[in-house]
C-alpha cells in the first residue's frame, strides 16, 4: 500500500508554504490538523488539481514522448533479437492499451522486442508536472497489468538471447566490460546522475551471478509487484548466460521523462513488475555493475540491487528489493543511504546499510543500550545551572540621584531600563520587590552597586529644594544689602529637666508658665518675644523654650537649628547632667554662641564654681578663666541676675552676630510647633525668618497648606503682620504641619496646594519604605513566624505634633524582647475621635488608644465601651512610657525555673496489690509535698524523672506535706522500681520574673 503524503511534503512539492496548503485543504472541506498530518491520495490529487486551476495552467494532453501519434503494435509473445550496439536506434513503441481512453505511459520497452529503443526526442517540461504524474501513474498501472503475462515469457526469451550474445560477441568500444561483481566499496553513480541516466548511454554489463534466488515468492510489500495468484518471473541470477549490454535497451533519458510521481499520487494497490533485463521503470537509473534490472517501488534492484525511488546505489549480488528496500544485495530503500554489499540472497537495510546513513546517523540496526555510569557521571558533571538574563543595562559608575522611598520604576526611568528587568535583578539578588513598591535606601544602594551605578539618595532638604525649584522658588537666593534691616535675636533656652528653664523665662516675661505645665515640666516648645530696655533703647528678644526631658531630643535639636544664641541653664546644686551635655552638643552642632546661666544659686548646696569646672571639660571656658564664654549666676524664683543675663545676650548678639534680614517679599520661616485646636482647627506656631507674613497670604508648611485667616501673638492678641524673628500663631491651615517644617508664602492657592501634595506623596513613600521590612528569600519563614508573636498595637493622639513625635520615638527606643512587638497603627494631633475608635475596633488584634494631653468626648467613650476598645490618658510623658513598657513586659510568655523543695531517703519498700510499691521514707531536707514533682536518685544518678508524689501519709493519716526529720509513706504515681537507699528529690516550677 502506497504511503500517504504529509502536508509539508505536499507544500515542498507545490513550492508553497505549509500554512497555504492547510488553508487550501480547509477550503476544500478537509480537516487537517498540522503540517505533519497525512493526506489521502485522492485528497492530494484534488489538492494538486486545485493548485493547477488556480495557476491558470491548462491540463496537458499526452505529450509526444509519452504517446507517439502512430504506434505500431507488435506480437506480444515473439521475441526479437537485439541489434548490434552500433546499429541505428529506433523509437520506442508503446504497448497498445487494454482500455481505451487511458493515455499510455512514456517510452517502455516491449517484452518481445529486446532491441534497444531509440531515445525519444527531449521535450520541454510541461507547465503542470502534477497532472502528468497522475496520468502517467494511472496509465502505468493499467499497462502493467495488461502486459503481465507477455512480459514474463518475453523476459525469459530475452535473458536466453542475452546469454548467447555474451558468449558469442565481445563488448563494443566504450561500453563497460563484464567483470566480477563490484564490492561494497565500489560505489556506482546514483540513478539520474549524468553518468548513469544519460540518454543513450549503454549500461555496464553484469558479471557472473552466483546462485539465484527462489523462483517464486509472494507479492510482499511491493505495490507494483506480482499480485496474489500470479507467477513471479525468475530472478536475474537464476543461472544461464547474462544478457549482453549491447542487447539491452538503454534507459530513457530523464529529460524525456515526466517527473517522478510523489507517494501521495500513487494508487494504493499497483500490479507487480518483472525485474527483467533493463526493464526499469521511467525514473530509475541505469543498471548497476554486477547486475541489471530495476527495483520495485521504493525497493532495491534485482540482481545487484538497482536503486529504487530515490534509493541509494545497490550493492553486490542478491535478490530484488521489496517495499522500502528489500534484502536484495544491499539495495537502497526510500531515501536511504548506500547499501552494503550483501551476500547471495542477503540484503542491506532500507534505512541505510552498513555504512553511515544520512545526517551522520550510524548505520546498522539501532540499539537502545543503557549508558554507562561513567557516561552518566560525565553528563551530570557537565551540567551547568541555567542563567537568567534580565537585560538590565550595566553602568560604568554613573551617578544616579534617587529620592527617599523611590521605586524600581523611578530607578528604571533614570537609567532608561525596563522596570521588569530590575524586578528580575532584585529576585536574582534574593529580594522580592515589585516595580511600584517604595524601596528602602539599602535596597536602592544594593541594586545600584550590582548594576554598576553610583546611587545617591537625595536628602530631604535637597529634595525639597529641587521641588521648590520647579516653581521658581529659591530659599537660598542672595538678598541685596540695601534690602537688609536689623532684626531681633532668637534665643533658645536649653538644659536638663527641672533645672529651671521655664521658670527663668517666667522671670524674664514676669509670668507664670510652669503652673500650666503638667508635672511641672515643659511638654512642647514655647516661643515668646519680650522687649528689654538696653542703652536707652527698647530691644526685642525672641525666646524659644525647649523641653529638657530626654524624650524631647528632636525638639531640642530643632530649637538649636532656628536660634541665634543658646542660653544653657545648669542648676548650681545638680551640676552637669546628661541632657545638659546633649543640649551643649546640639548648640555646638548648630555653631551658635552659648551663654551659660548658672541657676538656683540661692540654694544652700549651690556650687557655681563646680559648674564652671565641669563645663570646662566640654570646651566651655569662662571668661574669668581666660575663655570666651559668658557665665551668669541667676536665681529664677527671686529674680536675681535676670538683667545681667539679658545684657549678656544682647552683648553677644551685637559683638558676635550680624543679625539682618529683608522685610519685603514673600515670608519664609519655620514651624516651631503645631496642634489641632477643637474650635480653631489646625494651629501652627511659626517663626518668620525672611519677609513679612500678612493675614490672607497663601502659605504652605510641610504637607499642609492654606490661607492665613488670623495671626495671634504670645498673649493671644491678633496681629496684622509679622516681620523677621517674630513668632506668631497662624490659623487657617488644612492640616497640622510637622514640627520643624519650613513654611513659605506663595502668590496663589494653586501653587501652595501642588507643593503640599508633592511633599505628602514623597513623605508617604519614604515612610512606607522605612516601615516595611525587607522581604528576602532567607527571611521569608521568619516573617511567617512573626505572625505568631504577641504584639501591642497603639493609636497615639496628642495635643501637639512635637509631643506625639517625642512619645513615638521614646516607645520605639524601648528595649523590647523579641517575643513581643510594638506597632503604632496610627498617630495624630487632636482629641480622640470616633474614627480612631473605629480604626481600633476594625483591627484583628486588640488596640489601645493613648491620649496625651487630650481627652475623648462622652459619645466617643460610649462607643469605645461598646466596641471594647481601651483608652488611656496621660499628661506626663514619662508616665506613658513606663506604663507602656510594663504592658509590653506583661505580654511576655512566662518563664519557669525549678525550685527544690526537699529530699527523702527510702528506708523500706512495701508491696501492695492495690497501689503498687509504697516507699517508707524519712525526710532529710526541706519538705515533701503531695502532688509535687519528683525524681528518683540511686547512687547519685537519676533513675527516673518527671515523677509525681501520688499519695503521702504520716502513719495511717493522709498528709499534705511532711517536713524535715519526720517519717512518711508515699507512692510515686505507679512507678514501682524503688529500692532501699534510693533518694526521692521533690521540686516545683516557679514563674521567673521577666526583665
UniProtKB/Swiss-Prot annotation:
Pfam families: EF-G_D2, GTP_EFTU, IF-2, IF2_N. Signal peptide: none annotated. Residues 273-363 have a biased composition (Gly residues). InterPro entries: EF-G-like_DII, IF2_II, IF2_N, P-loop_NTPase, Small_GTP-bd, T_Tr_GTP-bd_dom, TF_IF2_bacterial-like, TIF_IF2. Residues 635-637 are annotated as: G5. Residues 495-502 are annotated as: G1. Residues 520-524 are annotated as: G2. Residues 135-160, 193-202 have a biased composition (Low complexity). Its main location: cytoplasm. Residues 53-399 are annotated as: Disordered. One of its GO terms (molecular function) is GTP binding. Residues 486-658 form the tr-type G domain. GTP binds at residues 495-502, 545-549, 599-602. It is found in: Cytoplasm. Residues 367-376 have a biased composition (Basic residues). One of its GO terms (cellular component) is cytosol. PANTHER family: TR-TYPE G DOMAIN-CONTAINING PROTEIN (PTHR43381:SF5), TRANSLATION INITIATION FACTOR IF-2-RELATED (PTHR43381). One of the essential components for the initiation of protein synthesis. Protects formylmethionyl-tRNA from spontaneous hydrolysis and promotes its binding to the 30S ribosomal subunits. Also involved in the hydrolysis of GTP during the formation of the 70S ribosomal complex. Belongs to the TRAFAC class translation factor GTPase superfamily. Classic translation factor GTPase family. IF-2 subfamily. This is Translation initiation factor IF-2. It comes from Salinispora arenicola (strain CNS-205). The gene is infB.
